[in-house]
């Protein structure tokens, strides 16, 4: 089975991850890396692939500009290029939604073999997963990671309220 874990926000890379380097580089990255590492060790999984957004920002590390980063023999981080190579925080990702969706569909179209299932993390990735299902019939599942539940009452901060919405 070929499984894609789709997560667009934060600085997702092989270890060592610099947690906290951006406001979006936190616990969900640990979850995704752990999930996919465990799946890659299974005999019935041929490829555990993390798909994220490609960007080029020297302050955040050169790895994020790489198209592919092999973490283990069956664990790959693939970065899709929407044409906007800036790092975008969660609240700014919606401006790149069309571009990253087009890039993801184009990436899938070029493949010899499509993934069997997509696991989308957060609503922005669910948009891409729905597009892949519409185009190719790929089944998908979704994890919201409870940002709003954990942080809604934590602070009276307009930027945080935008992120939660």
What name fits each language-model region?
Residues 1-165:
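Catalytic cores of nucleotide-sugar-dependent glycosyltransferases that transfer UDP/GDP/TDP-activated
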